[in-house]
Amino acid sequence: MRVGCDLPYFEDPGEIRAFVRGAEELGFHHLGFSEHVVSGRGTPYPDGFAPDDPWHESFTLLGFLAATTTRVELNTAMVLLPLRPAVLAAKQAAEIDLLSGGRLRLGVAVGWNREEMRALGVDPSTRGALLEEQVTTMRALWRDDVVDVDGVHVRLDGVSMHPRPRRAIPIWMGGGNFATGGVPPTPVVDRMARLADGWKMFAPLSFDLDAAAAAIERVRAAVRAAGRDPDSFGIEARLAPQAVPEEDWLARVEYWTALGVSHLGVANRKGAGGVDAELERLARFVNATRHLWTED
């Protein structure tokens, strides 16, 4: 199992630089973060964040992280893909992957904040169908010399993109919401099974281990039904060290290992204690669980 950590919501670039270098030195395999472009003041934030928490723009931050680190995988969790034109997102992702030496794992999701979507000209009711067309378009732009798309939401007439990435950039999808306890709805499971390289579990689901195990089996069954090999489909579970007693960290990692998940993301997004406190807690986590990680 490959284990990574989240970048806390530090606003200062010096703090970001110190944290990501420290996390890389601790041996984490991947570094994740999420985004919002704008915050809707009238929308309740169900995840404990506030509209004035600092959210960095994903691709700008990825460029900074690519220049700051040397080894760790850069993992968006998630890029709200419908907020961007497919061609622009394809170009940005290709550039980041090229400039980072092939270290991008692109996590995408449809988003939930309707005020944010409307501010960027996106119809919330079509965001799922839009994301599907975006993903297929982006892969075509990364792969093909000339691309034509005649979709409902994306239309291209004989365009090409250079430079193209030197590999197929993995695209993972999120799914689930607070109303369902993080369990992904059936349309989302079907979309992931058809189009994604992996599933990034929504954090609340990681607190209900039985529900998480059932959801994993459901996703794997859908991947199999789509004619794909579930063993080649990645699954990233979550663990929040600040919400799980320290004496239970090892047992929680053992649980995810037994379920056969490919990745684990260690969530610490608030970063209220500062860089040193966050890295100290992560160091304790590494010392307790490192023997269960996949070796590079």
Predicted regions and their residues:
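Active-site-adjacent structural elements that line small-molecule/cofactor binding pockets in enzymes
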Residues: 1-296
